Structures are given as structure tokens and as C-alpha cells.
Amino acid sequence: ADLYENPMGLMGFEFIELASPTPNTLEPIFEIMGFTKVATHRSKDVHLYRQGAINLILNNEPHSVASYFAAEHGPSVCGMAFRVKDSQKAYKRALELGAQPIHIETGPMELNLPAIKGIGGAPLYLIDRFGEGSSIYDIDFVFLEGVDRHPVGAGLKIIDHLTHNVYRGRMAYWANFYEKLFNFREIRYFDIKGEYTGLTSKAMTAPDGMIRIPLNEESSKGAGQIEEFLMQFNGEGIQHVAFLSDDLIKTWDHLKSIGMRFMTAPPDTYYEMLEGRLPNHGEPVGELQARGILLDGSSESGDKRLLLQIFSETLMGPVFFEFIQRKGDDGFGEGNFKALFESIERDQVRRGVLSTD
């Protein structure tokens, strides 16, 4: 059921599209996240990787919108797709409300996927064919023989959320973009201050409750991690994508066994402080600590709402991935934001990117 009015008929993410200026950069990353290649495009150098209900489109097609995006930004998420009830209707409405169209070249007998210009100029596709047997993949792709079409992989189920890092002063622009076109609402607002720098984050959620996009911008001090991302990425873009698991410890063990590299674990003090922060949380602290998994949420008055999360290292330029499990908490790990922000800041100081004068 929709949380509020859903004029575009949104129904979750359909896929994220990735591209790289150098060949064979992304395939190994998909593999260490537990994804399997299940299909190849009929006429283009484009491939479908899957795990659970997550679709990753690897676009290696030369002279494509994706290849130009990757040439400018490096290996990156160069597009994303929302599921909608009626793509032509949604597309028409988006254009009437001021969205810019993006033309994607199609071959004969191929679907024309309507797309508008999204974050960093990347296409935001509107897809209404996602039923098993009649999806865009059934029409435009050839499934590989003998490969499970819905591999379980490391137990990742769906795209939980993805973030946009934006230039200072542009958070309101992007919030308005999603509000005006899709009727997103702001569900969380954070102002995270580290010792030297800070960031502001506005978490936007679609009326279907399934598409969640936190927008991040640098606070007035500058020189922090959002600024560093924007410099490295050469513009605004998707900073990380979070995948949902229903057993993060098990997922972590699987990912670790296939070569996933995780962000440096928080200091021991983080785990010593957990009981004080979340009294009677009931999670196995030793197991979490051994894996560097973070815990957040609230546990007041016996009403436990928890969230477990862990991040990969930066795997594509400054872009990384998050693996998350929700036990009643629908936030983004705000309690960990500060803890993590400070640990990233310490890392920036160590690397000499940030001066402590």
C-alpha cells in the first residue's frame, strides 16, 4: 500500500545501470558481491547480473549514453530505473512537469525505454514491464543456458536505498526534483558534524515506500568527504547503493568467502559503547565485532527497532556499496553516521587530505 499519493504509480527500483571507461573493471566487483551474469542483450554489449530481486545492468556499449557518462566520471552507476504502472503516462507527466528527456538509441525490434535526465545527467528510466516472462529482459536479452535466472548469491534481496552526493546548495534542487515529479517526501533530515567538517543529509522516500534516496551535501566548512567525492567523481552522482539482506551475519560470511573487501571496522570502543547506546538490544556483539558490522536503531521501553549495516571499501573510484538488515528500523543508521563520519575523518587526516590546523 502506498504511504501517500503516488501520481507516477511507482513500485520500487527495477535496475541500476553501471559502466566503466576501462573494460573488465566492473565484472569482478559484481562477482565479489555475489551477483551472477544471467543474460546478454540481443544486439548491444550490455549484460544483466542478478541476485535475489536485484538487477544490475552492465553497459559496455561504445558511443552510448553510459559510455559517455563513464568517460566523464569513471566506473560508476550511470543510470537507474524506477518501476511505474504506465511508463508512457509517467514519462509524459514528467516532461509536462519540466523533466528533460534523454534519448537512448534502440535497435530494430527493441523496446524503447523512456528516460529522463537524473542526477549528474544520468538517465532515470521509467519501466512498466517487469512481470516474469514479459519483462524488458525477456524481450531485449537472451538468458544464458543452464544459469539460474534468480540466483540467491550472498542472500541480498533488493535495492534498499541509494544516495546522491550533490554540490553545496543543491540539496534543495534535487529534493524538489523528486518531490515535484514523483511526490517523494523528506522522511529524515540529519546534520552530521565531525570534529573538522560536516555534512547535511535529506532522506527522500517515494510514495511506494520502496524507493529511498538520501541526498548529501557538504556543510559550510568544506573540504570534507562529500567535497572529496565530488572532486574525484567529477560531479554529482550516486555515492553508494545499499542492498538488503535478511541475515547480515550470514551474508557477510558469504561475501567475505568470495573476496569482498569491507571498510575498516570501527574501533573497539564502538562496540563497548553499544549497550549504553542501545540497552538490551540482544544482538551478538562478539559476532558483530568480529565482522565490523554496525548496529543502530532504538531499544527504549522494550520496543526494539534495529538495523545492522556494513559498507564495502570504495570499489569503483569513490563509489562503495552497503549491505543492510532491518529489524523494524527504517532509518539509514543515523546513530552510526556520526561514529562513521568521525572514522572516515580520521582516515582523511591520516591520508593528509584533511588538515587539523
UniProtKB/Swiss-Prot annotation:
SUPFAM superfamilies given in the database record: Glyoxalase/Bleomycin resistance protein/Dihydroxybiphenyl dioxygenase
Superkingdom, taxonomy of origin: Bacteria
InterPro entries, A to Z: 4OHPhenylPyrv_dOase, 4OHPhenylPyrv_dOase_C, 4OHPhenylPyrv_dOase_N, Glyas_Bleomycin-R_OHBP_Dase, Glyas_Fos-R_dOase_dom, VOC
Annotated positions binding Fe cation: H161, H240, E322
Residue ranges of every copy of the VOC domain listed in the record: 12-129, 158-313
Documented EC number(s): 1.13.11.27
Name the UniProt record assigns to this protein: 4-hydroxyphenylpyruvate dioxygenase
Organism: Pseudomonas sp. (strain P.J. 874)
